[in-house]
Amino acid sequence: NNHDLIQNDEVDDFILSEKIISSVLAQIAENKKLADVFRELFVPEGSEIYLKPITNYVNVNKKINFYELVESAKLKKEIAIGYRLEMYSRISSNKINNKLANFGIILNPYKNDYVDFSEEDSLIVLSEN
């Protein structure tokens, strides 16, 4: 399965699986207005998901909450949707039971929680090419 491929080959990208496609279709079935959002994400000329250096957005010498990252991304006409903590990037959920164990990827984090980011961490954003 995809999870095993990621672990064995140390793949450092997102994989679009049947589970994600099923989730998208279920969301559109419940709310037709979401179709436009997903269309923007999935057409070649639409916005894309990028992992960009956290240092492009904030100074990492202090604790930062996600709200600050959202505002910083907004100034660049991007939408912050999460972040990746590099120190957890090689840890899968099979190895430990922890929210940070998803290869360091945190999507839709609590905006008021403060995090100590390192220079190696990334912000996950929606942005036009």
Model feature map: region roles:
Residues 1-129:
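Cytosolic regulatory regions of ion transport systems
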